[in-house]
Amino acid sequence: MTEYYDLNLLEKETSEENNFHTKNQQVREDLSILYSILVALEQLEKAFTKDAVSTSDFNSTCELLIQQWESCFSDERVTQAFGSFEDFCSKYRLQCPRAIKRIQEGISDERSQSNSTFSNAISTTAEPSIAMNDTTPQTVNPTKAPSNPSASIAKSIAGLVQNFITTLDAIRLNFIAKDQLHPLLSELIVSMDDLTESLKIQVSCRNKLVQWLIKINNMNITDQLNDVEKRELLYDLEQAYAECYSLL
């Protein structure tokens, strides 16, 4: 695949508005999660069309991702910041037509099912015990999804994308000191290793990121990357992301 998603997830604002310790950080994190879900779901849809994922795994993973999607929108601030699908995808240069359609259909189906269940409950009020027994199998088991290999891979993809976004965003905001960069880059490499191990693939750009991690680890606690190093690290991270995406 030649195209890949633009990682400039969040437009540059003032340093005060983008401070990781402000109240808006949770909104930024939720937007990153939404971005990750769209990317993961788009890849899942493509894998399903190639018979790389079974129907049962596909359905359960879609259900999990849609539940996570709706959970993010429980915060009204996230809803306002997200806007519409068109606004969000245009702003962050996303091309996820399959994912958008699946989410829209999934939410619509859930609402229809909820209304149907409610109507059935009313019609069987004369036999409440039967109604309760009928609805019991519809309860979602929260421990079921993690045991699903496809769900685990989708979660790993979403986590890797989010780590790329967080690391790149931090560097662009000049979080370039050792104590700021080291944990971000470490977590990114770990999440990359988890995914590549699951998919049995190798990422050549990983070596460059490891070299950066070693270099940052050898810095003094007060040291920061200079402008040239900052640009080089950003470039290597973007190259690594592009390679990861092309392998999915």
Swiss-Prot record:
<dbReference type="GO" id="GO:0043328">
    <property type="term" value="P:protein transport to vacuole involved in ubiquitin-dependent protein catabolic process via the multivesicular body sorting pathway"/>
</dbReference>
<feature type="domain" description="VPS28 C-terminal">
    <location>
        <begin position="152"/>
        <end position="248"/>
    </location>
</feature>
<dbReference type="InterPro" id="IPR037206">
    <property type="entry name" value="VPS28_C_sf"/>
</dbReference>
<keyword id="KW-0472">Membrane</keyword>
<comment type="similarity">
    <text>Belongs to the VPS28 family.</text>
</comment>
<feature type="region of interest" description="Disordered">
    <location>
        <begin position="128"/>
        <end position="148"/>
    </location>
</feature>
<keyword id="KW-0813">Transport</keyword>
<dbReference type="InterPro" id="IPR038358">
    <property type="entry name" value="VPS28_N_sf"/>
</dbReference>
<keyword id="KW-0967">Endosome</keyword>
<dbReference type="GO" id="GO:0045324">
    <property type="term" value="P:late endosome to vacuole transport"/>
</dbReference>
<dbReference type="Pfam" id="PF03997">
    <property type="entry name" value="VPS28"/>
</dbReference>
<feature type="domain" description="VPS28 N-terminal">
    <location>
        <begin position="3"/>
        <end position="113"/>
    </location>
</feature>
<comment type="function">
    <text>Component of the ESCRT-I complex, a regulator of vesicular trafficking process.</text>
</comment>
<dbReference type="InterPro" id="IPR007143">
    <property type="entry name" value="Vps28"/>
</dbReference>
<dbReference type="InterPro" id="IPR017898">
    <property type="entry name" value="VPS28_N"/>
</dbReference>
<dbReference type="InterPro" id="IPR017899">
    <property type="entry name" value="VPS28_C"/>
</dbReference>
<keyword id="KW-0653">Protein transport</keyword>
<protein>
    <recommendedName>
        <fullName>Vacuolar protein sorting-associated protein 28 homolog</fullName>
    </recommendedName>
</protein>
<comment type="subunit">
    <text>Component of the ESCRT-I complex (endosomal sorting complex required for transport I).</text>
</comment>
<dbReference type="GO" id="GO:0044877">
    <property type="term" value="F:protein-containing complex binding"/>
</dbReference>
<dbReference type="GO" id="GO:0000813">
    <property type="term" value="C:ESCRT I complex"/>
</dbReference>
<dbReference type="InterPro" id="IPR037202">
    <property type="entry name" value="ESCRT_assembly_dom"/>
</dbReference>
<dbReference type="GO" id="GO:0031902">
    <property type="term" value="C:late endosome membrane"/>
</dbReference>
